[in-house]
Amino acid sequence: MKYDIIGDIHGCLQEFQNLTEKLGYNWSSGLPVHPDQRKLAFVGDITDRGPHSLRMIEIVWELVIHKKVAYYAPGNHCNKLYRFFLGRNVTVAHGLETTVAEYEALPSHKQNMIKEKFITLYEQSPLYHVLDEKRLLVCHAGIRQDYIGRQDKKVQTFVLYGDITGEKHADGSPVRRDWAKEYKGTTWIVYGHTPVKEPRFVNHTVNIDTGAVFGGRLTALRYPEMETVSVPSSLPFVPEKFRPIS
């Protein structure tokens, strides 16, 4: 099987359409379909900050849950939206406010439909996907070699948030260790979470979050070709969001 793994979309629907078309997908059915049966995989954070978060929920639900032709691994923004939909006490900030504004503008029956779709998508998706006979792993923020195969709380924190130190940057965002430099495995780990200006290949890991929602690009990794394909963002460039790992 061949896969096209998509970086953090964050509600950037137009960029997602542009990227999938560039990858050879046809949207005539209303969903991206590849003539060679390639499958899409999402590294999470499909919502928040961008203009079309709810439409992205519908598309990913349709592909992953209804048609079962794609893969989705939740990100930290997905986890927070999930908790919001469950009625938990979450701070509506750091991008969640844009998704909530879209949601609250809907009539109640459409709100319920979106909520049910996202809760189902989140609950039926694993923390990470191991594909191609363990040669490929798709997750949100990365994973340590010794965590592969585990699903416990420590692993959940790592795949959602990265290798956080507990310290904070001046803007309140967490300081993260560069786990990829220590990775010695042969399974390719494809992830996002931390915006980088160019796709970052380190050992057998690839960070494909090129900051579409911050004016960078939306990037896909074609597997097993190991080629990256990108399209430019339509949003303003925010250089301070492209931070070094540590």
From Swiss-Prot:
A GO cellular component annotation in the UniProt record: cytoplasm
Example GO molecular function: nickel cation binding
EC number per UniProt: 3.6.1.17
Cofactors: Ni(2+)
SUPFAM superfamilies in UniProt: Metallo-dependent phosphatases (SSF56300)
Reaction it catalyzes: P(1),P(4)-bis(5'-guanosyl) tetraphosphate + H2O = GMP + GTP + 2 H(+)
Domain of life: Bacteria
Coiled coil: none
Keyword annotations: Hydrolase, Nickel
Biological role stated in the UniProt entry: Asymmetrically hydrolyzes Ap4p to yield AMP and ATP.
Family from the record: Belongs to the PrpE family.
Name the UniProt record assigns to this protein: Bis(5'-nucleosyl)-tetraphosphatase PrpE [asymmetrical]
